[in-house]
């Protein structure tokens, strides 16, 4: 298990490098299999009427066309669910690329879809085309919405707006709300410390090195436990295990302790606790909304935007980039 934890931890620490690598679900436990649209396979639907009827569907007698989207990409069906057709042509291959967060249709009929790694527009040759956007390193999209002819794309840290023909985007950094105190949850602090991301790429590399050290300790420990007949191999493994373990025990304990804290019951206490962000770390950001934005929708009744974040719900005035906390929300 330790070997598996170390290797998987290194890979997850550099997710962008392995996002094109896929593993068939048939090699995973049964709870990871898609059955009856479970596991986030169906996140939402979009009614597109009959305007988007593709050639292969011309003879299908159905009421309206629907797009279904989720962790498996996008699918075309009708209001009777009488068929399901793959609607992913043009999207990059790979499970990460096809985690579709939202699909919308603008008033002018144009259709956009967003995944954590890209924004796509449906158009020429009846397929998806990626929309080029300038993003910060490691920045990921979370949602997309529209009002009138204004397209709004939400990332984990910024709001992007665009007008026809939707080729250029304006990045908006939202102002801090009145109740902003700069504190972060203890859970997030421990999470970033465990991965090393708390100290940027340098911290990640250090944690990767610790994981490699743990791999060496596991291998040398297994060799010593097996007691090979070759005394030279036994002595070498014991020497390495002892020397490396002595010098790295503090770092190894740090990784083990922070990993243990990320699971219940300690995790619950950390989630409910807030502490000041540590100076000199990635948590101390000039952007008060760094890695906090999740969902955005236009509120027709209030004529503003409804913003969901890891800190709660807010009403948003995009023009002024100001937010106001909404207190009357479900617990």
Where are these regions (language model features)?
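Repeated scaffold domains used in trafficking and secretory/extracellular systems
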Residues: 36-60, 93-108, 137-149, 286-298, ...
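Beta-propeller fold detector
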Residues: 24, 84-90, 129-135, 168-183, ...
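Juxtamembrane interface at the cytosolic side of transmembrane helices
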Residues: 1, 201-257, 262-264
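Loop/turn residues immediately N-terminal
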Residues: 71-75, 81-82, 116-120, 156-160, ...
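Alpha-helical transmembrane signal-anchor/signal-peptide segments
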Residues: 11-36, 262-290
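Extended, hydrophilic extramembrane loops/domains of integral membrane proteins
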Residues: 151-189
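Conserved beta-propeller blade signature
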Residues: 65-68, 75, 110-112, 150-152, ...
């Amino acid at each position: 298990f330790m070997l598996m934890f170390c290797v998987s931890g290194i890979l997850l620490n550099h997710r962008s490098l392995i996002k094109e690598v896929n593993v068939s679900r048939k090699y995973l436990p049964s709870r990871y299999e898609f059955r009856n649209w479970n596991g986030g396979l169906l996140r939402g639907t979009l009614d597109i009427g009959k305007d988007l009827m593709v050639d292969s569907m011309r003879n299908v007698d159905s009421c309206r066309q629907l797009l279904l989207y989720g962790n498996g990409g996008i699918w075309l069906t009708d209001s009777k669910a009488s068929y399901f057709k793959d609607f992913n042509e043009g999207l990059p291959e790979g499970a990460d690329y096809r985690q579709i967060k939202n699909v919308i249709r603008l008033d002018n009929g144009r259709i956009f879809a967003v995944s954590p790694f890209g924004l796509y527009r449906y158009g020429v040759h009846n397929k998806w085309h990626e929309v080029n956007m300038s993003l910060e390193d490691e920045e990921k999209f979370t949602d997309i919405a529209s009002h009138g002819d204004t397209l709004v794309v939400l990332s984990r840290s910024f709001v992007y707006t665009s007008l026809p023909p939707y080729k250029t985007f304006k990045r908006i950094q939202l102002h801090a709300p009145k109740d902003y105190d700069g504190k972060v949850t203890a859970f997030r602090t421990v999470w970033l410390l465990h991965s090393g991301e708390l100290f940027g790429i340098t911290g990640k590399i250090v944690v990767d090195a610790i994981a490699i050290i743990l791999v060496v300790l596991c291998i040398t420990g297994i060799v010593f436990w097996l007691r090979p007949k070759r005394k030279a191999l036994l002595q070498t493994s014991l020497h390495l295990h002892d020397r490396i373990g002595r010098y790295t025990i503090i770092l190894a304990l740090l990784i083990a302790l922070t990993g243990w804290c990320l699971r219940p019951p300690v995790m619950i206490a950390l989630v409910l606790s807030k502490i000041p962000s540590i100076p000199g770390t990635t948590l101390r950001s000039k952007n008060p909304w760094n890695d906090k934005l999740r969902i955005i929708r236009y509120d027709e009744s209030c004529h503003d935007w409804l913003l969901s974040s890891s800190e709660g719900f807010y009403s948003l005035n995009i023009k002024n980039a100001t937010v106001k906390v909404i207190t009357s929300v479900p617990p």
